[in-house]
Regions:
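Rossmann-fold NAD(P) dinucleotide-binding segment
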Residues: 59-74, 78-97
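Glycine-rich Rossmann-fold phosphate-binding loop(s) that bind the pyrophosphate
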Residues: 12
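Hydrophobic Val/Ile/Leu positions in short beta-strands of Rossmann-like dinucleotide-binding domains
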Residues: 7-9, 73
Length: 335
């Protein structure tokens, strides 16, 4: 693709760290800087690194100083991205992993206007779900007409760590730290695999388990009530809340495992049985999301080169745009 893509990381938590590692492992990209609400914390964490770190609120300053081709937005979906996304898309092209499924249409519209008005490209809501799983749902429903794709998450006994839901809990007043694990219901998976497109509610497909560390003065009952009634995140599900110490959280829940599957069962036009199933398992959820984000950064630049502007999702992007291989190489290696 010629010159290396210059990428700024906006927000430096677990996903931001994963994005940094993924950029450094990509031969066609370079990290030009990190922007954060707390640049001093990031500088301290990076130590003697020569990576430039600037205040995310000084948009004119860091876009001028860092000269990024695009920014990968690594903030949370509950409060960060709804505000930061449109604001930043008005200044440069962006990629993000906004994962509040119910709000994606509204977020898309806001990002589309901001990016289109400024001639930028904003790729939104990518990762593995939303993202890869979104694409798998469309493929399954297209290849097996009339089928209903189902998504299941947290297939292991310990469940899968949800970063977005954990972040949403941490934003509740009185919460010091938290982890949220999603568990798939095995009976629901069995029903889907048997065919017939069963009608299943969200609560019949998954349940949620929370491990929360409270501030000293926090009201445990109020926090639990807030969690269980949080729209989109917890309200539709059976949710178990556990209050533990910070030491226990650090020892027992320090990793970031997750995984899931998309299953679609039905019939072909001649009545033959048909089933499509896609599964992924990640040792680190943030590293997985970061890897997908970085591939979409490559696609963003190709869309920009094509003269495109506005918001896009994984559903709008040719798969070849994610790869750093040429068309000839892709045909030879993967076709």
């Amino acid at each position: 693709m010629g010159e290396k893509i210059r990428i700024a990381i906006a927000g430096y938590g677990n996903v931001g760290r994963g994005v940094k590692a993924a950029i450094e492992a990509s031969s066609d990209m370079v990290l030009c800087g990190i922007v954060s609400r707390n640049p001093e914390r990031v500088k301290k964490e990076l130590g003697a690194s020569d990576i430039m770190v600037m205040d995310i609120n000084d948009i004119a300053g860091w876009t001028r100083e860092l000269s990024p081709d695009l920014a990968i937005l690594c903030g949370g979906s509950s409060t960060d991205l709804p505000v930061q996304g449109p604001k930043l898309a008005a200044h440069l092209s962006t990629v993000d992993s906004f994962d509040n499924h119910g709000e994606i249409p509204n977020y898309f519209n806001a990002m589309d206007k901001a990016a289109h008005d400024s001639g930028n490209v904003a790729v939104i809501s990518t990762g593995w779900d939303p993202g890869i799983f979104s694409l798998e749902r469309v493929l399954a429903s297209s290849f097996i007409p009339g089928v209903k794709p189902y998504g299941f998450y947290g297939l292991s006994e310990s469940g899968g760590l949800s970063m977005g839901h954990s972040d949403a809990i941490r934003r509740i007043p009185g919460v010091k730290d938290a982890r949220q694990y999603t568990h798939a219901e095995p009976d629901a998976i069995a029903k889907v695999r048997s065919g017939g497109n069963p009608v299943l509610t969200a609560g019949e497909m998954h349940w949620r388990e929370c491990f929360i560390v409270l501030e000293d003065s926090a009201d445990a009952g109020a926090v639990e009530e807030t969690v269980k009634n949080m729209p989109n995140y917890f309200a539709p599900y059976r949710t178990v809340v556990n209050f533990i110490t910070q030491d226990e959280l650090n020892i027992r829940f320090s990793g970031f495992p997750h995984g899931g599957c998309v299953i679609a069962s039905g019939t072909t036009a001649d009545g033959g049985s048909a089933q499509i199933e896609y599964q992924c398992n990640w040792g680190s959820n943030p590293a997985a999301t970061a890897s997908v984000l970085v591939a979409h950064a490559r696609a963003t630049m190709r869309l920009k080169k094509d003269g495109k502007s506005g918001a896009f999702t994984i559903l709008d992007i040719p798969p070849a745009y994610f790869s750093n291989l040429s068309r000839e190489e892709l045909l030879k290696k993967f076709m």
